[in-house]
Regions:
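Small/polar-rich, solvent-exposed N-terminal microdomains that initiate assembly or binding
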Residues: 1-52, 86-100
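A residue-level signal for beta-strand positions that form part of recognition/binding surfaces
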Residues: 37-38, 59, 104, 125
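Short, well-ordered turn and helix-capping elements at secondary-structure junctions
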Residues: 43-48, 66, 111-113
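Short, acidic Gly/Pro/Ser/Thr-rich loop/turn segments
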Residues: 48, 133-135
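Oligomerization/assembly interface segments of phage tail-like spikes and tubes
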Residues: 54-72, 79, 121-132
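Acidic-leaning, charged glycine-interspersed low-complexity segments
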Residues: 85-131
């Protein structure tokens, strides 16, 4: 069985030098109180399944958080640009997250400020759509 999609995206970020590792500075489906700097991946409701295939349309929000707004924004932009660069070199808009996992990726918008929390940490993020296997 394949890894969960979010774990494969963490592996992609680590391979690109954009994160240290799962549970270290990169988290899946939650944002812990510590550390202050994090990358968090959240999956939410996707679109209907792709007819006549075993593919599904999944929705992911990629967020970054730091006490320094410029650092949070810069990291979100680095991740966005890494995905964008991979898409520009692919004829079919496919990103290979791992050797086993690929996805046709749609960057839904560029990074934007989401919030400032009670600890004065700023969160930036952006949303992507991924057509891939269910797992």
């Amino acid at each position: 069985m394949a890894n969960p999609l979010l774990l494969d995206i963490v592996s992609y970020l680590v391979d690109k030098g954009l994160a240290v590792g799962d549970g270290e500075d990169c988290f899946r489906d939650f944002s812990p109180e510590t550390p202050d700097f994090i990358v968090a991946l959240h999956e939410y409701k996707g679109d209907p399944v792709v007819p006549f295939t075993d593919l599904v349309n999944r929705s992911i929000q990629i967020t970054t958080r730091d006490r320094n707004a410029d650092i949070a924004r810069r990291k979100a932009l680095e991740i966005y640009k890494a995905l964008e660069a991979d898409l520009e070199t692919s004829e079919s808009l496919v990103v290979h997250f791992t050797e086993e996992r690929w996805g046709q990726v749609h960057l839904r918008q560029s990074p934007f400020k989401i919030k400032t929390d009670a600890e004065n940490r700023v969160t930036y993020g952006f949303n992507i759509g991924i057509t891939t296997t269910i797992e």
